Amino acid sequence: PHAVVKLNLFEGGSMVHRELIASGIVSIFQKLYAHSWGPRLEYILRNTLLTLLSQNAKLEDILRMLTDERYRHKVVESLDDLVLKNFWETEFNKMQEKQRIEAISPILNKVGQFVTSPLVRNVVNTNQSSFSIEDVMNSGKILLVNLSQGKLGEDNTALLGAMLITKIQLAAMNRVYIPEEE
């Protein structure tokens, strides 16, 4: 029996990297759902991601941020970023309930599809990844990942594969901060 690998896209989010991480996650969902993508969906998702990247968040917290008023208030109160704070307080919270439900439904649908899958949830519902892509890259290790569509299903395979590629891209971009002599 193989141990379940844990993967959290939200970790490692220093101020410099948060925008890259949010952009990477938005790109994943945009590629998976290109046929039903829109500017409002992207705007709300991006603001949600940037907000959660300042927390110790995981994928399912996107749903919680959009639907749980008490949780959202607590998170927004802790924000240092005034632009994000303004989004939640003057845009999102001022929407009529019907308008808000209409705006967040596509996000809940897309993210919820993966969070409700026990297979995906076992991998992404974690505050810390079980391995470091940076460590794999910087120490010359080999990473083998079984993303069999027969075991996971096509959508789940696409999501997990895209998440892994995004983590690899972010780790590669972080290498610019490693001194040349290392």
Which positions does each model-derived feature cover?
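P-loop NTPase motor domains
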Residues: 1-182
